[in-house]
Curated annotation (Swiss-Prot):
Keywords: Cytoplasm, Dioxygenase, Fatty acid metabolism, Hydrolase, Iron, Lipid metabolism, Membrane, Metal-binding, Oxidoreductase, Phosphoprotein. Found primarily in platelets and in microsomal and cytosolic fractions of the epidermis (at protein level). Changing I663 to D/R/K/G: Loss of activity. It catalyses: (5Z,8Z,11Z,14Z)-eicosatetraenoate + O2 = (12S)-hydroperoxy-(5Z,8Z,10E,14Z)-eicosatetraenoate; (9Z,12Z)-octadecadienoate + O2 = (13S)-hydroperoxy-(9Z,11E)-octadecadienoate; 2 leukotriene A4 + O2 + 2 H2O = 2 lipoxin A4; 2 leukotriene A4 + O2 + 2 H2O = 2 lipoxin B4. The modification Phosphoserine is found at S246. Residues 115-663 form the Lipoxygenase domain. Changing I663V: Nearly full activity. The gene is Alox12. Catalyzes the regio and stereo-specific incorporation of molecular oxygen into free and esterified polyunsaturated fatty acids generating lipid hydroperoxides that can be further reduced to the corresponding hydroxy species. Mainly converts arachidonate ((5Z,8Z,11Z,14Z)-eicosatetraenoate) to the specific bioactive lipid (12S)-hydroperoxyeicosatetraenoate/(12S)-HPETE. Through the production of bioactive lipids like (12S)-HPETE it regulates different biological processes including platelet activation. Signal peptide: none annotated. GO terms for biological process: arachidonate metabolic process; cellular response to lipid; establishment of skin barrier; fatty acid oxidation; hepoxilin biosynthetic process; leukotriene A4 metabolic process; linoleic acid metabolic process; lipid metabolic process. This is Polyunsaturated fatty acid lipoxygenase ALOX12. Activated by EGF. Arachidonic acid conversion is inhibited by (13S,14S)-epoxy-(4Z,7Z,9E,11E,16Z,19Z)-docosahexaenoate (13S,14S-epoxy-DHA). Arachidonate 12-lipoxygenase activity is decreased when PH decreases from 7.4 to 6.
Length: 663
């Protein structure tokens, strides 16, 4: 006879408990025992029970659960179950972290991470095969739009597997804050009904309510060239700027601009010439909103970096040259102030489109969804890489599904207020896929390719590289615990299937863009996993959080333009500027949505600080603890640096980086 102490831990969010009766069995190597237990699990509770079992069960392998119901299937969210056997102080941990519902019996394997083939007992191999077969029926791929990465097969959030859904607090916060934002938007529209809308200062009438301190700074300084240039390095979209290696072929310098050409060539020779080219937007059809045509441009911006690290614009060409049209107008800082301002506004509008669609939606959200679906389909719960990745896919499938049904859907937010809406956004995304390379998702490669290494004022670049290094050390520490050689990597069939699923299925044969179809070494695996974790955490934080700060003051980054780009500098008036910018309704909706999507989430889990105990090995706990310590040290370093800056760069402070893409 032996005594077993069983601890049952229930989730802490709303409706995690259950009124249904739960029964448990302990399954050991020799036999199993049904526990005389009638449990009705309560939300947020840890409940302990002692049981005397008459026969030796042997080493524990599984805990089996059965939730009985008569009339109502009251789902239960079980975090984990631990069992302390006779004669030992050690606990066997059985992670669950899922909803228990329906009539069937759920088996939870003992949580030690195991590779395929590591199992001395065939029972674990059969379990992981059965689990993957069931998961592949639950998590299916779908094509949202031809030519784009595959998505989870779900027409709406209610079609998602229950374990990928928002928990109740998250759902309520998401839906109620959106309603509060819409209410605020309505109040702003009423407030402006009988007031003029003829000058830039009139935007002050709606610049109240939900905004940040940095948004107020943008409001005050947005017309300054220095802040315009700063945004290419450290704003909402630090992903487009590159150091020039030659003068762009599309740059047309009219006669009489020899002095500008000499300046450009001098900066080029000194290595201080930079460019931001929005050519991806060329030819994308613009939206028509309520019968009113909107407009798009494909600007080219030439900038120089002064000795103090300030990035300053030298010239803006709003449209690329067209053989059937006159040479495009080149706008300069010396032009009439309103003409130069309008040229910069056109650039900011173009940056809004690429930031939201290419670098935010495609390069973080859709890539993370591919990683999430492939992980659920190919890696069983016992696999160490599943345990490593699963905290970083929390809520991603639901937020992406909501995006496809509310934001970028037919009649959604993009169609209502954004100049690439109405179908242009899909064309733009399809074009952007060609630029979605493996290297583009890895900051050491991407920043080197764009010539942005070792620039003191490039704060995104500096912080991204440090976070990449910290994440890479964490990943390497975990991988080397389970893969002692390259041969073990090559011989892991589940891992290799996961790699192929991402590259060939989810990313639609992306091997021609540098993504691997197999892993041949530990180093290659570590690099790929670092990319996965970084994309789902730090990169999304850098791209998402800036919306609240940089897009809240609408003239700094208008979602749409209502007049075509100017072709003459002398004809630009305040009427032209205001007629180009979004009207009150569109401006209010832009402020509402960017606040809703860019704010810090009240239930956020900071990077590396997830509480789920998927790993039970003490060695993995030591690796995670070191990761957390490294992040804390980086936090202190960034905080100390920011105290010396007029414009602190906060987006990659580890405490502000969410552990997964949840918004």
């Amino acid at each position: 006879m032996g005594r077993y102490r069983v601890r049952v831990v229930t989730g802490a969010w709303l409706f995690s408990g259950s009124l249904n009766l739960v029964r448990l069995w302990l399954v050991g190597e020799h036999r199993e025992a049904k526990l005389e237990l009638q449990l009705r699990p309560a939300r947020g509770k840890e409940e302990e029970f002692d049981f005397d079992v008459p026969e030796d069960l042997g080493p524990l392998q599984f805990v089996k659960l059965h939730k009985q119901h008569t009339v109502v299937d009251d789902a239960w969210f079980c975090n984990l179950i631990t069992v302390q056997g006779p004669g030992t102080s050690a606990e066997a941990v059985f992670p669950c972290y899922r909803w228990v519902q329906g009539e069937g019996i759920l088996s939870l394997p003992e949580g030690t991470a195991r590779l395929a083939g590591d199992n001395a007992l065939d029972v674990f191999q059969k379990y992981r095969e059965k689990e993957l077969k069931e998961r592949q029926q639950t998590y299916c791929w779908a094509t949202w739009k031809e030519g784009l990465p595959q998505t989870i097969a779900a027409d709406c959030k209610d079609d998602l597997p229950p374990n990928m859904r928002f928990h109740e607090e998250k759902r309520l916060d998401f839906e109620w804050t959106l309603k509060a934002g819409v209410l605020e938007m309505g109040l702003k529209r009423v407030y402006t009904l009988l007031r003029s809308w003829n000058h830039l200062e009139d935007f002050d009438q709606i610049f109240w309510g939900q905004k940040s301190a940095l948004a107020e700074k943008v409001h005050q300084c947005w017309q300054e060239d220095e802040l315009f240039g700063y945004q290419f390095l450290n704003g909402a979209n630090p992903m487009l700027l590159r150091r020039s290696t030659s003068l762009p072929s599309r740059l047309v310098l009219p006669s009489g601009m020899e002095e500008l050409q000499a300046q450009l060539e001098k900066e080029l020779k000194n290595g201080s010439l930079f460019e931001a080219d929005f050519i991806l937007l060329d030819g994308i059809p613009a939206n028509v909103i309520r019968g009113e045509p909107q407009y798009l441009a494909a600007p080219l911006v030439m900038l120089r970096m002064d000795p103090g690290g300030k990035l300053l614009p030298m010239a803006i060409q709003i449209q690329p040259p067209n053989p059937s049209s006159p040479a495009p107008t080149l706008f300069l800082p010396s032009d009439p102030p309103l003409a130069w301002l309008l040229a910069k506004i056109w650039v900011r509008n173009s940056d809004f489109q690429l930031q939201e669609l290419q670098f935010h939606l495609l390069n973080t959200h859709l890539v993370a969804e591919v990683i999430a679906v492939a992980t659920m389909r190919c890696l069983p719960g016992l696999h160490p890489i599943f345990k490593l990745l699963v905290p970083h896919i929390r809520y991603t499938m639901e937020i992406n599904t909501r995006s496809r049904t509310q934001l970028i859907s037919d009649g959604g937010i993009f169609d209502q207020v954004v100049s690439t809406g109405g179908g242009g956004h899909v064309q733009l995304l399809t074009r952007a896929v060609a630029q979605l390379t493996y290297h583009s998702l890895c900051p050491p490669d991407d920043l080197a390719n764009r010539g942005l290494l070792r620039i003191p004022s490039a704060l995104y670049a500096r912080d991204a590289l440090q976070l990449w290094e910290v994440t890479a050390r964490y990943v390497k520490g975990m991988v080397h615990l389970f893969y002692q050689s390259d041969d073990i990597v090559r011989g892991d069939p589940e891992l290799q299937a996961w790699c192929r699923e991402i590259t060939e299925v989810g990313l639609c044969h992306a091997q021609d863009r540098g993504f691997p179809v197999s892993f041949q070494s530990r180093a290659q695996l570590c690099h790929f996993l670092t990319m996965c974790v970084f994309t789902c955490t730090a990169q999304h934080a850098a791209i998402n959080q800036g919306q609240l700060d940089w897009y809240g003051w609408v003239p700094n980054a208008p979602c749409t333009m209502r007049m075509p780009p100017p072709t003459s500098k002398d004809d630009v008036t305040m009427e032209t500027v205001m007629g180009s910018l979004p009207d009150v309704q569109k401006a209010c909706l832009q402020m509402t949505i960017t606040w809703h999507l860019g704010r810090l989430q009240p239930d956020m889990v900071p990077l590396g600080h997830h509480t789920e105990k998927y790993f039970s090995d003490p060695r993995t706990k030591a690796v995670l603890s070191q990761f957390q310590a490294d992040l804390d040290n980086l936090e202190k370093e960034i905080t100390a640096r920011n105290e010396q800056l007029d414009l602190p760069y906060e987006y990659l402070k580890p405490s502000r980086i969410e552990n997964s893409i949840t918004i």
